[in-house]
From Swiss-Prot:
<dbReference type="GO" id="GO:0009505">
    <property type="term" value="C:plant-type cell wall"/>
</dbReference>
<comment type="similarity">
    <text>Belongs to the glycosyl hydrolase 79 family.</text>
</comment>
<comment type="function">
    <text>Beta-glucuronidase involved in the initiation of H(2)O(2) metabolism via the production of baicalein. Unable to use glycyrrhizin, gypsogenin-3-O-D-glucuronide, luteolin-7-O-D-glucoside and apigenin-7-O-D-glucoside as substrates.</text>
</comment>
<dbReference type="Pfam" id="PF03662">
    <property type="entry name" value="Glyco_hydro_79n"/>
</dbReference>
<keyword id="KW-0732">Signal</keyword>
<keyword id="KW-0378">Hydrolase</keyword>
<protein>
    <recommendedName>
        <fullName>Baicalin-beta-D-glucuronidase</fullName>
        <ecNumber>3.2.1.167</ecNumber>
    </recommendedName>
</protein>
<dbReference type="InterPro" id="IPR005199">
    <property type="entry name" value="Glyco_hydro_79"/>
</dbReference>
<dbReference type="GO" id="GO:0052748">
    <property type="term" value="F:baicalin beta-D-glucuronidase activity"/>
</dbReference>
<dbReference type="InterPro" id="IPR017853">
    <property type="entry name" value="Glycoside_hydrolase_SF"/>
</dbReference>
<dbReference type="GO" id="GO:0016020">
    <property type="term" value="C:membrane"/>
</dbReference>
<feature type="signal peptide">
    <location>
        <begin position="1"/>
        <end position="25"/>
    </location>
</feature>
<feature type="active site" description="Nucleophile">
    <location>
        <position position="329"/>
    </location>
</feature>
<feature type="active site" description="Proton donor">
    <location>
        <position position="212"/>
    </location>
</feature>
<comment type="subunit">
    <text>Homotetramer.</text>
</comment>
<dbReference type="GO" id="GO:0004566">
    <property type="term" value="F:beta-glucuronidase activity"/>
</dbReference>
């Protein structure tokens, strides 16, 4: 396929790829977009989590969780409901560290205390808590009424014994390791799954076993052999319970920090697994004063991040494995994120880049930590007012289709561009992130290849303050109306004979509805 690149008055004609010509300051930048998709995501790729941390969860003197746990969150709040409905469907992952301390009420006559109490003498530093049947019904009613899908995290430690052993190597004491051994007691989980089916909760997309008990363990570890045996039990259990339903929910595990050796053994031993999940906090600590620089320089694209993605893809692509890869939890900075960073415009440089990069490497779903709770929520804790990343997530969901196109940029290191087949047209959607604080990105589009018109969604911070919790779309402030309705996200239509321009330190989604030269993006009639 032909393309033309204009550079200082020179027209160069080449073939096989579709090129775009861009200008960064005085530099000419060439953007290459391959015509054939290199990966495919789920249609509802964007996912968000609801955790279990209580109000007493604090990091660095900051206690940002409030009543955001799915045990105590106000599920009738209009803003929350409206925010979730805008995705319809939004994949919601229920779980987190304390899911392995959660038990499920089996009779309404049983006492059921839903509070996790701090106690450093106990596993994970918290007491057990209980999910009541009434609360489970409320959660499922919320999922149904908001048009969502649920992925629920089961307690994988029930029945196991925790052992603490010293680590000695070459005569030196290296600390302690905490391991959970023994068989998984699945009786409580079995009740919850059976109860859910009897109640007709068909919006449960999958059941996840455990949280961060494998891979690079942070608190308690389970061996890959034991974890595989437990996952097999869960598969047998769900298959038996759903045997008359035609389809069954997904079996998802392990939801851990990736470790190549551990994941390889676990997945090799678990051919029944549908989804292999890993968690990502590649910005480092939420207490890091240098977090702003990490975001602006995109230094989170380090070798550890790349090897994690590539390693998991190699495992799931091995013969005999049917599992696909999800990011089951990604908050950027661990320990609740950082106030003034994770909940502001600047965090979009991490979030949007990771959405794009993950999709390129055939990740099917990307679950943001959190919908609300901590400093990294898409919605602010307590007020539920959308943070800037909420609008970025919603635009991605609406504009970026499942087919992923590979891009290559020649001429600058400060710009990242991702491209997908468009969600609702036969064209493509590009996402352009300008990490340059001084110069705009200017890109020329050939109307003969991309059509005559485009739709721009340009996101910029209020008053050019990168740490603003407010964001503008095409120069207009985005805010809720008095009744908590999410604002319309309307594009500006531009003529493709004119360059598109992305301001310094900003992002832009560009929808090119076509007709384009991307035949792979053409949808069947009526779709």
């Amino acid at each position: 396929m032909g393309f033309q690149v204009w550079q200082k008055g020179l027209c160069v004609l080449c073939f096989s790829l579709i090129f775009i010509c861009g200008v960064i300051g005085e530099e000419t930048t060439i953007v290459k977009i391959e015509e054939n998709p290199v990966a495919q995501t789920d249609e509802n790729y964007v996912c968000a989590t609801l955790d279990l941390w209580p109000p007493t969860k604090c990091n660095y003197g900051n206690c940002p969780w409030g009543k955001s746990s799915f045990l105590n969150l106000d599920l009738n709040n209009n803003i929350i409901r409206n925010a979730v409905k805008e995705f319809a469907p939004l994949k919601l992952r229920f779980g987190g560290t304390l899911q392995d301390r959660l038990v499920y009420q089996t009779s309404r006559d049983e006492p059921c205390d839903s509070t996790f109490y701090n106690n450093t003498n106990l596993i994970l530093d918290f007491s057990h808590a209980c999910l009541s049947l009434d609360r489970w019904d409320e959660i499922n009613q919320f999922i149904l009424e908001t048009g969502s899908e649920a992925v629920f995290g089961l307690n994988a430690l029930r029945g196991k014994t925790v052992e603490i052993k010293g680590i000695i190597k070459d005569g030196q004491y290296l600390g302690e390791t905490t391991t959970a051994v023994g068989e998984w007691d699945y009786s409580n989980s079995k009740f919850l799954i059976e109860y859910s089916l009897k109640k007709g909760y068909k919006h449960i997309r999958g059941w996840t076993l455990g949280n961060e008990l494998g891979g690079h363990t942070l608190f308690i570890g389970v061996s890959p052999e034991d974890y595989a045996n437990d996952a097999k039990k869960l598969h047998e259990l769900v298959k038996e319970i759903y045997q008359d339903q035609g389809t069954m929910p997904l079996i998802i595990a392990p939801g851990a920090i990736f470790d190549l050796e551990w994941y390889t053994e676990f997945i090799d031993r678990t051919p029944e697994l549908h989804v292999a999940t890993h968690h990502m906090y590649n910005l480092g600590s939420g207490g890091d004063d240098a977090l702003k620089d990490v975001l602006l320089t995109a230094s989170f694209f380090d070798e550890a991040t790349k090897s994690m993605y590539e390693g998991l893809q190699k495992i799931v692509n091995r013969p005999g494995t049917k599992a696909v890869a999800w990011i089951g939890e990604a908050g950027g900075a661990f320990n609740s994120g950082q106030d003034g960073i994770s909940n502001t415009f600047i965090n979009g440089f991490w979030y949007l880049n990771m959405l794009g990069y993950s999709a390129l490497l055939d990740t099917k779903t990307f679950c943001r930590q959190t919908l609300t709770g901590g400093n990294y929520g898409l919605l602010q804790t307590g007020t539920y007012i959308p943070n800037p990343d909420y609008y970025s997530a919603l635009l991605w969901h609406r504009l970026m289709g499942s087919k992923v196109l590979k891009t290559e940029i020649v001429g600058t290191k400060n710009v990242y561009i991702y491209a997908h087949c468009a969600k609702k047209s036969n064209g493509i959607t590009m996402l352009v992130l300008n990490h340059d604080g001084e110069s705009s990105v200017k890109i020329s589009l050939d109307p003969s290849k991309y059509g005559s018109k485009r739709e721009e969604y340009h996101l910029t911070p209020v008053n050019n303050n990168l740490q603003s919790r407010l964001v503008k779309l095409n120069g207009e402030l985005l805010h809720l109306d008095p009744s908590g309705v999410i604002p319309a996200l309307n594009p500006v239509e531009k003529d493709n004979s004119k360059q598109l321009e992305v301001a310094p330190y900003s992002f832009m989604f560009v929808h090119l509805p076509g007709p384009t030269m991307f035949s792979a993006c053409e949808k069947p009639a009526g779709k």
